[in-house]
Amino acid sequence: MTDTVTHTEAATSKYVNVLEGGTELRVHYNDTGAGKETLVLLHGSGPGASGWANFYRNVDAFANAGYRVILVDCPGWGKSDSIVCTGSRSDLNARVLKGVLDTLGIERAHLVGNSMGGHSAVAFALSYPERVGKLVLMGGGTGGPSQFVPMPTEGIKLLQGLYRDPTLENLKKMLNVFVYDASTMTEELMQTRLDNMLARRDHLENFVKSLTANPKQFPDYGHRLNEIKAPALVIWGRDDRFVPLDVGLRLVWGLPNAEFHVFGRCGHWAQWEHAERFNQMLLDFLGQ
């Protein structure tokens, strides 16, 4: 039986240099070490986000089940270098992830992506299908615009407003619609997120510059989803006010080998709001 280990951000923190468009980027990642298979966790695009901040409730469950867990800070977030993206952010993240995996000598990995991370996982699967084991997509994956909710959604408007005016008040406004139960957003969590945001004002400024240069950072790959043959698990929050539920349905319609699970009483952060059930669901899916 595998010993239960509690992993920390500091103990798993590492860096790698990756070439992107002729520029060398220093990319931060967390790595739990050797495992039977590799599981890569890709975070969303919110201000102050990082691999660890998005998935700290999930790391131990996967690592203690025998997986090597890697959490990548995408360029422009966390401890990675900042960047202005004038093209597809999804494809940029996919290329950087390939560079990270190449450097680490990892030929194949399962990808778990939340929001922007889902978009990036889909872009990676389209460009490098032979490198993907299974896909797990939560609240993202470029299924196209909602058919029922005007775009940009309430949550995306608040997210973009927070980037432009990074205050505690605006952070609270965004987090209050980020999850189903806003009372779980403690003052400590909000302060930590605010500190993470303000520690890297270059990330905030470059995100706004990127939006100005190209408002469509995450292109719609809905018409190409049928090319992805990897088994996929699509997970959504019924009450997601950032990326509505019908976008998840479009993913399932497009992906030829997909399953779909909806959490009730859940917003945009399924892996955090329903961590225990989420963790077991992924382990069951990966073990099939």
Swiss-Prot record:
Catalyzes the cleavage of the C5-C6 bond of 2-hydroxy-6-oxononadienedioate and 2-hydroxy-6-oxononatrienedioate, a dienol ring fission product of the bacterial meta-cleavage pathway for degradation of phenylpropionic acid. It comes from the Bacteria. Residues 39-274 form the AB hydrolase-1 domain. The keyword Transmembrane helix does not apply. Homodimer. Belongs to the AB hydrolase superfamily. MhpC family. HAMAP family: MhpC (MF_01654). GO terms for cellular component: cytoplasm. Pfam families: Abhydrolase_1 (PF00561). The lineage of its organism: Bacteria, Pseudomonadati, Pseudomonadota, Betaproteobacteria, Burkholderiales. The record marks 115 as: Transition state stabilizer. The record marks 193 as: Catalytic role in ketonization of the dienol substrate (substrate destabilization). One of its GO terms (biological process) is 3-phenylpropionate catabolic process. Keywords: Aromatic hydrocarbons catabolism, Hydrolase. One of its GO terms (molecular function) is protein homodimerization activity. This is 2-hydroxy-6-oxononadienedioate/2-hydroxy-6-oxononatrienedioate hydrolase.
